[in-house]
Amino acid sequence: FKRYAVELPRVPLPRDLPATTAPAVAVLAGTADVSPTELDLPQLSRLLHLSAGVVRTTERPYATWFFRAAGSAGGRFPLEVYVAVPDGLGLPAGLHWYDPLDHALVQVGPQPRGHAPALVVTGVPWRTGWRYRERGYRHVYWDAGTMLSQLLAAADSAGLAPRLHTRFPDAAVA
């Protein structure tokens, strides 16, 4: 798991996740009848857990195995999730990294421009590249597709109306 070398402000996320009554098949088919809602801290916690979190652990005499919500080619887990938080949501405004092991947000940057929260999925190619060489980039993209589909389904099932942006606005961020 990724770790930041310095102590940064951390916000533990709620572990009591809100439930949904939407059938999974209806959510995936786009036919679920779910009342629209706004993103709040419990829903954000649910989205992060169901898309990038540790959902189960197994203890062995030689190691502890962590099972993540989204599968990963070869178990390399090259993706990181960041949450851009303007004022609100019960969190300090800023850019936060999701720590899946502790189910917490770590503030790594200042308050973003804009008025809506955003989840940003980034890839760390060397995590797959050292094993899969030139095919490593493909595995990052496959993993991103898996995680994003779970994230969108979890958001849809909660009535959050997510939007996926696949073109990063480099000029706006620079």
Q: Which residues make up each language-model segment?
A:
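N-terminal accessory segments that position/regulate proteins before the catalytic core
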Residues: 1-174
